[in-house]
A protein has these predicted regions:
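Membrane-embedded alpha-helices and immediately adjacent juxtamembrane helical segments
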Residues: 1-300
């Protein structure tokens, strides 16, 4: 037992003195200290309630704006449905049944506002917790409500614009391959900007320059999850369908949203650990005192 402890202590000192190991470990430890898994679950549940009103709003707005170009409307809409890989096929099969009238726009606006406001509130709580902003220094009413509204607007506009750019990039029309690549790259860059703005709005006392890496990692991770995570979860949904039936789709979508939320919070923790200098962290100390330097750190 003493030999195992000595080996663990040696590895602990090694990871603290090497950033390639020490920094990722500090991020994971900070994630656990903050209870970020629970925070991600709240965000995912709120997002679940916002998905379908947001989809209705997207379909209605695109139907109004692109009513004279059915081909472009169809291409953009299908590219937007890729954002829902678990239920994308079902949505594509039944998308024409959605109401594209003024009533659909009103219902979509109300449902989207209520649902995404829950996501915005949960995101504010999560990021302020992770950045260790005391509650007395967090914005109260009505400023927190105004921030939530701004987050909703940024996310909504960002979704529509990136869906449009992805539609151009994924098309096979008259535009050349260079323009399609440029459209996809621009959509990714816009996602980075959107996440930067959302993170800044959701956090009370953090500078713009401290958020760029987390925003970039979030955009990159979201694209990776859209490509690989959706496939894996769709595979699990097929296995769950025999037991849960139709509810397997709901469980699959919930799992995918949770993965997205968890990935986002991990990306935020990268910024927190980097900016707040929350590493190196000891593997054995719960007080945040590093074995390698003897310097004290805060709880996180």
């Amino acid at each position: 037992m003493t030999g195992i402890r000595a080996l663990l202590a040696r590895f602990d000192r090694y990871q603290q003195s090497h950033a390639a190991l020490g920094f990722p470990f500090a991020v994971v430890k900070k994630f656990g200290d903050d209870g970020a898994g629970n925070l991600a679950a709240v965000i995912a549940w709120s997002a679940m309630l916002a998905v379908f009103p947001l989809l209705l709003l997207l379909v209605t707005v695109l139907g109004i704006v692109l009513r004279n170009d059915p081909s472009l409307h169809h291409r953009i809409l299908n590219s937007a449905l890729v954002e829902f890989p678990v239920i994308g096929q079902q949505l594509q099969e039944n998308i024409n049944s959605l109401n594209r009238s003024g009533v659909g726009l009103i219902v979509g606006l109300i449902g989207t506002f209520l649902g995404t406001r829950g996501v915005a509130n949960a995101l504010q709580n999560a990021l302020n917790t992770m950045w260790e902003i005391p509650r007395e220094r967090q914005p109260g009413f009505p400023w927190n409500a105004m921030r939530s509204l701004a987050i909703v607007l940024v996310l909504g506009i960002g979704l529509i614009v990136t869906a449009t750019l992805s539609g151009f990039g994924g098309g096979t029309g008259a535009i050349g391959a260079g323009l399609r690549i440029a459209a996809v790259a621009l959509a990714f860059a816009l996602n980075v900007v959107v996440f930067s703005v959302v993170f800044r709005l959701a956090t009370a006392e953090v500078a713009w320059k401290d958020l760029w890496l987390g925003a970039f990692l979030t955009a990159l991770g979201w694209e990776a999850l859209l490509t690989f995570g959706g496939y894996l979860i769709a595979h699990d949904v097929k296995n769950m369908s025999a037991v849960y039936g139709t509810f397997a789709l709901v469980l699959g979508l919930m799992s995918w949203l949770y993965l997205q939320a968890e990935l986002t919070l991990y990306a935020v923790e990268v910024d927190v650990v980097r900016v707040r200098h929350r590493w190196p962290r000891s593997m054995t100390s719960t007080a945040g005192v590093t074995a390698a330097t003897g310097e004290g750190t805060e709880r996180a």
